[in-house]
Structures are given as C-alpha cells and as structure tokens.
C-alpha cells in the first residue's frame, strides 16, 4: 500500500471520527485524564524551566514548542495512553465491521 493510499485512509477515518462525534468524546476524555494526572502542570513547569534558561531569553513560541513537545509526549502516563488507544481501537473495530 502506498503512502498516498494510507493518507487517504487516515483522512477518511479522521473525517468519520469527527462527523460521528467520537473525536470530541475521545478528545475530552484525553484532556480530563491528562488534567487528573497533573500532566498540564508538569508540561507548564517544563516550559517555564526552558524559558528561564539564560540562552533562551529570546525564544519564540514555535522553538519552545519544538523543544518541549518530545518530553511532553513522553510524560503522558502509560495508563492514559493505553486507555485512549483502547477507545480508538474499539471505535475502529466498530467502523470496520
């Protein structure tokens, strides 16, 4: 399967997720779980630490985002990641059947 075909399939799934309302439900669940686990606070602290470093005084948002994003993604608790992935898999299994 070509990359173009994979991109088309991904776009169709995303469109269906949005139109069915499942995207909003999964997104809300993810945000709630991240909030409950203190992820937003931890990422905020990480960004603040980066901004306070002397060599980052003129840091742009885009550069700060690029610096913090990999660490922020790795800080998502495994149980949250697994729970959301399970919801997505269940949704896909329903759609494919």
Swiss-Prot record:
User: Does the keyword rRNA-binding belong to this entry?
Assistant: no
Instruction: Kindly indicate whether the keyword Transcription regulation belongs to this entry.
Output: yes
Which keywords label this protein?
Answer: Activator, Chromatin regulator, Cytoplasm, mRNA transport, Nucleus, Protein transport, Transcription, Transcription regulation, Translocation, Transport
Fetch the InterPro entries from UniProt.
Answer: TF_ENY2, TF_EnY2_sf
Gene Ontology CC terms: DUBm complex; nuclear pore; nucleoplasm; P-body; SAGA complex; transcription export complex 2
Q: Where in the cell is it found?
A: Nucleus, Nucleoplasm; Cytoplasm, P-body
Q: Which Pfam families match?
A: EnY2
GO MF terms, alphabetically ordered: transcription coactivator activity
Query: Which terms does the UniProt entry file under GO BP?
Result: chromatin organization; mRNA export from nucleus; protein transport; transcription elongation by RNA polymerase II
The subunit structure is: Component of the nuclear pore complex (NPC)-associated TREX-2 complex (transcription and export complex 2), composed of at least SUS1, SAC3, THP1, SEM1, and CDC31. TREX-2 contains 2 SUS1 chains. The TREX-2 complex interacts with the nucleoporin NUP1. Component of the 1.8 MDa SAGA transcription coactivator-HAT complex. SAGA is built of 5 distinct domains with specialized functions. Within the SAGA complex, SUS1, SGF11, SGF73 and UBP8 form an additional subcomplex of SAGA called the DUB module (deubiquitination module). Interacts directly with THP1, SAC3, SGF11, and with the RNA polymerase II.
Which family does this protein fall into? Belongs to the ENY2 family.
The protein's role, per its UniProt record: Involved in mRNA export coupled transcription activation by association with both the TREX-2 and the SAGA complexes. At the promoters, SAGA is required for recruitment of the basal transcription machinery. It influences RNA polymerase II transcriptional activity through different activities such as TBP interaction and promoter selectivity, interaction with transcription activators, and chromatin modification through histone acetylation and deubiquitination.
What is the protein name for this chain?
Answer: Transcription and mRNA export factor SUS1
Q: What is the lineage of its organism?
A: Eukaryota, Fungi, Dikarya, Ascomycota, Saccharomycotina
Gene name, per UniProt, is SUS1
